Amino acid sequence: MKNKYLKSLFAFLLFLNISICSNATVMPRSMGGEDRIKIINYVPNAVFRYIGHYYYQTIIEFSLDEEIQTITMGTPTPWQIVPAGNRIFLKPIEDDATTNMTVITNKRMYFFEMHAKNADSINDPDLAFIIKFVYPSETKDRKSVV
């Protein structure tokens, strides 16, 4: 009886964990050494949270073999957006810049939750000069070749 209870509890906790993780917003993190250079793990069907800073531009860089095909935004007016190959240059230019953005490349689809705020200074650790996507499957493929 105790075994059955533990199995049920384990199954419930596993389900709860999967539900929470699948609805989590993914945030960029610093690579180490330079806080303004950030990476973000690509997770299919995740929403990536981006915080832009007024008066500063950021590059979002996708895989080298990706090319941007379409960018759409809920409210594009507050943002300056310049696509270039596998990169997007982003800069908030108006107040109330909260919106969403979808990027479709030749390989993947990305969903972004967009926000903007003022930076404390050019050395603000929340400021991102570049955000590079990292793809776990590509990392595994490279390791298996070595």
PLM features per residue range, with description:
Residues 1-10:
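Bacterial N-terminal signal peptides that target proteins for export
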Residues 10-19:
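Bacterial N-terminal signal peptides
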Residues 22-146:
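A general "mature secreted/periplasmic domain" signal
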